[in-house]
């Protein structure tokens, strides 16, 4: 016979961003707890609102499964003395298992007998296991936590109720000074405290108190209500997934409605309006069927439709205040002079150990000069890049960005266009922030891409130079994201810029305000981002490519893909093993690897030396790999007929030189001795 278990934790309002991860974590930890306790179940369903986290287990076994375990002990010759009595070794072994020597039996393994005991544990009733659920609740982790009312234990928010039901049976467990009961809280304004009758009546009991416990149901309610508004008014409403997820975690009983604002505010840039609505007020944006922004918005109330007109008016009033600010800053910022703002950046600190934002811009500008050549920009693009680099942070001192910091770069583009700058300069100012997340949008223009790389590189190198290096999960200056952005942009544009050579060039630049250091750490940091971009590529292949001598990002990613592609083919293992053997021996070469044909003693030496001399890796990675694998028979013949480590030192070094030249060329693809072929 199976049972159904419900656990609900009632809390003060949770931050919206914490709700979904905490709900998921509760479900996962409950499943792990039950499995660890040998309690089978059919399904687990989780619930969450801003004021509760809950989990229901259905089809839960009414008792633990019995456990039978065999334990191997000492050999019989050690377990028995000369008189046939059990020794202290045998007695200690069984005592440690909670058994006696009478439980011992002997079993033969490979011709020798050993002590064995069998321990049986009868499963307990589920009721005896339920109290352990408190440990599950205590084990939940949160990005932020607090303690209250003299409690030393920290939690995400103060706990108000705990409900643990096994079907209809109530458990009065203690958790953070709260005693469990079947009482739960309804909606803060529309509902009352209510008793949950059983584990299976949970949703309906709360629904009567205006709480929709299932987040999927709340989400569908919001979407359906928005679709109804769309159909009624003939508009298009942007249902942003992130905003939807945030809103559903702000409400327990959602009611969507449409509000409006004066059309005069549409003269303000659309990005300002959208930011005001979406980022600051958590409103959904409304457009006409052609995609044009309308003076309307969609909000979701935490409650029903009663007195909705008053709610709409209140939301409109709050939004208008934000739009008034936006309109004011838009008007006033146009009176500012870009060059004046750039000069004032001398007084804005980039970081106290690094200097001002203006100094950061100057260094970035010098880096763009270097990158422009490597990226083969045209004359016009180079001119636009220089101008963009000279002013690209100016909008940080505008009123609009001061009020809406999400618009940095975006407003820079708009203000530069109004000031008569070229579209390329304006676009680069917007694009230099890209990507803003791990999978974020990349710059579209070459000028913007180069400026983005330069800005990020100076940021990375500057922080490394003063010892502000990310450690563990701690990365307060988002240097990992910046590095990932550099790597992604280089790959997307297919620029064959070797990162090691680029970093060398940057270290050669002499900045008055800052001296770059920690080159090795920087290179390892960049390699770690390339490693991440390789995704699920096997670890040994990643290591082989990252250990190679070619540090062009696009080439490295292509090489890893090519190796994965052919790793299942028949000739992969023998070809890699041949090259790997060459790599291992080449490490023994001394000095400059020059080959003297006069020292050849067999045709196989000559054949390999000639093959290496004519080897020029070219074309896509798959073609280069074929070129290298084609050498496998020549390498094998060389090893079969040649004693590389000959007694004659000159001959030995000559043969090592052949292998050294081979591996130097092959290492431009990968270090093959890093690949596991076993």
Swiss-Prot record:
Quick check: keyword Protein biosynthesis in the entry? Answer: yes
Name a GO CC annotation attached to this entry: cytosol
Extract the PROSITE patterns matched here: AA_TRNA_LIGASE_II_GLYAB
What EC number(s) has UniProt assigned to this enzyme?
A: 6.1.1.14
User: What UniProt keywords are attached to this protein's entry?
Assistant: Aminoacyl-tRNA synthetase, ATP-binding, Cytoplasm, Ligase, Nucleotide-binding, Protein biosynthesis
Q: Keyword Hydrolase on this protein?
A: no
List the catalysed reactions.
tRNA(Gly) + glycine + ATP = glycyl-tRNA(Gly) + AMP + diphosphate
Instruction: Write out the annotated subcellular location.
Output: Cytoplasm
Q: From the UniProt record, which GO molecular function terms apply?
A: arginine-tRNA ligase activity; ATP binding; glycine-tRNA ligase activity
The Gene Ontology biological process terms listed for this entry are: arginyl-tRNA aminoacylation; glycyl-tRNA aminoacylation
Q: Name one Pfam family in it.
A: DALR_1
- Where's it mainly located? cytoplasm
In which domain of life is the source organism classified?
Bacteria
The UniProt family comment states:
Belongs to the class-II aminoacyl-tRNA synthetase family.
> What subunit structure does UniProt give?
Tetramer of two alpha and two beta subunits.
* Cross-referenced PANTHER family: GLYCINE--TRNA LIGASE, CHLOROPLASTIC_MITOCHONDRIAL 2, GLYCYL-TRNA SYNTHETASE
Protein name as catalogued: Glycine--tRNA ligase beta subunit
Which gene holds the coding sequence for this protein?
glyS
């Amino acid at each position: 016979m199976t049972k159904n278990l419900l656990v609900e934790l009632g809390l003060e309002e949770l931050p919206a961003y914490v709700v979904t991860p905490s709900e998921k974590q509760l479900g996962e930890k409950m499943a792990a707890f039950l499995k660890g306790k040998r309690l089978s179940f059919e399904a687990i369903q989780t619930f969450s609102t801003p004021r509760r986290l809950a989990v229901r287990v259905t089809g839960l076994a009414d008792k633990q499964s019995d456990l039978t375990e065999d334990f191997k002990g000492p050999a019989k010759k050690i377990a028995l003395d000369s008189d046939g009595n059990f020794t202290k070794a045998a007695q200690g072994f069984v005592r440690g298992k909670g058994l006696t020597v009478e439980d011992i039996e002997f079993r033969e393994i490979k011709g020798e007998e050993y002590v064995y005991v069998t321990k049986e544990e009868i499963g307990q009733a589920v009721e005896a296991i339920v109290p352990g659920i408190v440990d599950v609740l205590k084990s939940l982790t949160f990005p932020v936590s607090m303690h209250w009312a003299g409690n030393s234990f920290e939690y995400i928010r103060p706990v108000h109720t705990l409900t643990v039901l096994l079907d209809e049976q109530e458990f009065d467990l203690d958790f953070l000074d709260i005693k469990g009961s079947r009482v739960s809280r309804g909606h803060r304004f529309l509902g009352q405290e209510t008793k949950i009758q059983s584990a299976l009546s949970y949703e309906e009991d709360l629904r009567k108190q205006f709480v929709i416990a299932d987040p999927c149901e709340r989400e569908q309610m919001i979407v359906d209500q928005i679709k109804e508004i769309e159909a009624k008014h003939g508009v298009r409403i942007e249902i942003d997934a992130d905003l939807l997820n945030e809103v559903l975690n702000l409400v327990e009983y959602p009611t969507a409605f449409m509000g409006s604002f004066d059309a005069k505010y549409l003269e303000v840039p659309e990005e300002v309006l959208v930011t005001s609505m979406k980022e600051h007020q958590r409103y959904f944006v409304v457009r006409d069927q052609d995609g044009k922004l309308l003076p309307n918005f969609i909000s979701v109330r935490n409650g029903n439709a009663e007195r909705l007109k008053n709610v709409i008016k209140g939301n409109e009033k709050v939004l208008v205040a934000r739009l008034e600010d936006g309109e004011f800053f838009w008007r006033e910022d146009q009176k500012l002079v870009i060059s004046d703002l750039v000069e004032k950046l001398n007084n804005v600190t980039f970081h106290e150990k690094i200097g001002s934002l203006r100094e950061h811009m100057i260094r970035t500008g010098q880096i763009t000069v270097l990158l422009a050549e490597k990226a083969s920009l045209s004359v016009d693009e180079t001119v636009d890049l220089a101008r963009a680099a000279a002013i690209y942070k100016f909008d940080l001192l505008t009123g609009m960005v001061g009020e809406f910091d999400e618009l940095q770069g975006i407003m820079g583009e708009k203000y530069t266009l109004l000031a008569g700058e070229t579209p390329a300069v304006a676009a680069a100012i917007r694009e230099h922030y890209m990507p803003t997340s791990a999978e974020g949008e990349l710059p579209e223009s070459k000028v913007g891409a180069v400026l983005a790389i330069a800005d990020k590189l100076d940021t990375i190198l500057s922080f490394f130079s003063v010892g502000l290096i990310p450690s563990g999960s701690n990365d307060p200056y988002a240097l990992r994201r910046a590095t990932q952005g550099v790597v992604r942009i280089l790959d997307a544009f297919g620029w064959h810029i070797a990162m090691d050579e680029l970093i060398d060039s940057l270290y050669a630049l002499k900045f008055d305000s800052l001296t770059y250091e920690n080159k090795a750490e920087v290179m390892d940091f960049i390699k770690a981002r390339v490693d991440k971009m390789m995704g699920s590529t096997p670890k040994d292949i990643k290591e082989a490519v990252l250990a190679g001598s070619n540090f062009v990002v696009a080439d490295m990613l292509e090489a890893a893909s090519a190796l994965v592609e052919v790793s299942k083919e028949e000739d992969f293992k023998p070809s890699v093993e041949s090259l790997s053997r060459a790599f291992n021996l080449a490490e023994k070469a001394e000095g400059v690897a020059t080959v003297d044909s006069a020292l050849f003693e067999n045709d196989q030496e000559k054949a390999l030396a000639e093959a290496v001399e004519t080897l020029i890796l070219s074309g896509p990675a798959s073609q280069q790999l074929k070129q290298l694998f084609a050498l496998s028979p020549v390498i094998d013949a060389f090893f079969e007929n040649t004693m590389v480590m000959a007694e004659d030192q000159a001959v030995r070094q000559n043969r090592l030189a052949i292998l050294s030249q081979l591996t130097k060329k092959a290492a431009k693809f990968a270090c093959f001795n890093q690949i596991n072929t076993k």
